[in-house]
Amino acid sequence: WDSFDRSGGSLYGGLKLEMVSEGDPAGKQAARVRAIELTAKTGVIYVDVSSELAEDVYIFGRALENALRGAIAYGLDTQFIAGRGGAEALGILNADCAIEVSGTGASNGAVQYEHIVKMFGRMHPAGRRRCVWLANNDLLEKLLNVYIPTTEGNVIFPMQLDGRGGYTMLGRPVIFTDILPAVGEGGDLVLVDFSQYAVGLRREVTLERSN
């Protein structure tokens, strides 16, 4: 659905509540959908293992399988976040809808509270309840040191522990990853609504062996 079109007070490109008197007919309405084109690509990890190693080490097969699954998961995350399109997936950092917000008075990769507020303010209202922060791992200390002084002489820290070992910022979850660009480069801190990112998986991950 074209859920971001609210022109004329309607939703989904044309649905709007009408108030009618008893017995009066309701006007016919039509919503609008958006076309999404998905291009299939194949992701592969090829590993050459000698039969001696596979036979002599009892747990090697299971260990290799776990390693491959972890590498595939990390590879998919990398594609969906930083993929450049073409032969790769088109990641969120390189999507046409990405909006870059410059920091205010930022230097040496410092994060300013004004920067965080600008990013949250540019998020579409419908996405503010679903969005998450993605942050470079090296931003952890910098984000923990962002604070807002109050008139009473106290300070407020926008990033807080969520009680489950994670963090939230302005009420939204913060996920740290090493996939994002280095601190100080564009994309080291991202606010994204993943409900607007489409992924089509034609089949589940399979592990195949050949002698």
Model-based region annotation:
Residues 1-130, 150-156, 161-169, 173-175, ...:
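Acidic/polar, low-complexity extended loops/arms that serve as protein-protein interfaces
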Residues 140-149:
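Short active-site loop/helix that positions an aromatic residue
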Residues 183-192, 196-211:
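Short, intrinsically disordered, charge-balanced linker/junction segments flanking boundaries
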